[in-house]
């Protein structure tokens, strides 16, 4: 089983862990890095969908050398999901579990193992790509990420957003399973996904799996934050957890 999660916009460069490996798709990442280097201020503003001030700040990231990474992917992202995953306080068995099972989907790097070394960057899957030979990052990556994830596993637990899981969904073949995990809360008589709470729950679920060395058969036992497995809403390729607001 593989577990996929989205990256985070917020990144850091300080941490107590060192990279153990280089990204599988480092060559492709360097091609995208070179493309970003080729753009002027106006072009970068389009790609990053940012104003001049934010673009100038983000442009400083491009000085980094992708072959000289600063942190492992698992510790470089610092968004809400990663805060609740809290990998920095997992024991070695938990880290080994993540190294084997977890993958971070990325616009720049495609797919990342937890201890692949990366640098801070800004590039989302839906970023426009002016003056590039590919119309989109989806076209650029094609089947590459799908093939890498499914070459040894037929089951992927999907905790990524639709923006990132679309790296996989168009290419699924017979026998492949992409098991979507959904967190819902009741509000005013309706069940909805609350984005902030869902990010927290995704991070905690990954941690819960790693702490116990758990697999798919254990998934229904997750109850953190008051969530409970909802069998009537779940199916072969969808696991739903619900809680009362």
Swiss-Prot record:
Protein source organism: Lactobacillus delbrueckii subsp. bulgaricus (strain ATCC BAA-365 / Lb-18)
Similarity comment = Belongs to the UPF0246 family.
Highest taxon above the source species: Bacteria
Provide GO CC annotations from the record.
Answer: cytosol
Q: Please state what the protein is called.
A: UPF0246 protein LBUL_1917
- Gene Ontology terms: biological process: response to hydroperoxide
């Amino acid at each position: 089983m593989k577990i996929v999660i989205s990256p985070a916009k917020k990144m850091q460069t300080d941490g107590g862990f060192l990279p153990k490996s280089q990204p599988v798709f480092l060559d492709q990442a360097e091609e995208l890095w070179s493309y970003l280097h080729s753009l002027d201020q106006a072009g970068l503003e389009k790609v990053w969908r940012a104003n001049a001030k934010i673009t100038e700040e983000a442009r400083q990231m491009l000085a980094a050398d992708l072959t000289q990474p600063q942190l492992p992917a698992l510790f470089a992202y610092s968004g809400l999901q990663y805060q609740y995953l809290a990998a920095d306080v997992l024991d070695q068995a938990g880290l080994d579990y993540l190294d084997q099972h977890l993958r971070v989907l990325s616009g720049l790097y495609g797919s990342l193992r937890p201890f692949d070394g990366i640098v801070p960057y800004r590039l989302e899957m839906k970023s426009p790509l002016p003056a590039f030979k590919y119309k989109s990052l989806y076209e650029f990556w094609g089947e590459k990420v799908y093939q890498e994830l499914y070459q040894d596993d037929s089951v992927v637990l999907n905790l990524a957003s639709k923006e990132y899981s679309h790296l996989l969904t168009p290419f699924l073949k017979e026998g492949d399973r992409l098991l979507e995990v959904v967190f819902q809360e009741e509000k005013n008589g309706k069940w909805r996904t609350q984005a902030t709470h869902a990010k927290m729950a995704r991070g905690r679920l990954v941690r819960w799996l790693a702490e116990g060395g758990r697999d798919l058969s254990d998934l229904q036992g997750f109850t953190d934050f008051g969530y409970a497995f909802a069998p009537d809403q779940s199916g072969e390729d969808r696991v739903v957890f619900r809680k009362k607001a």
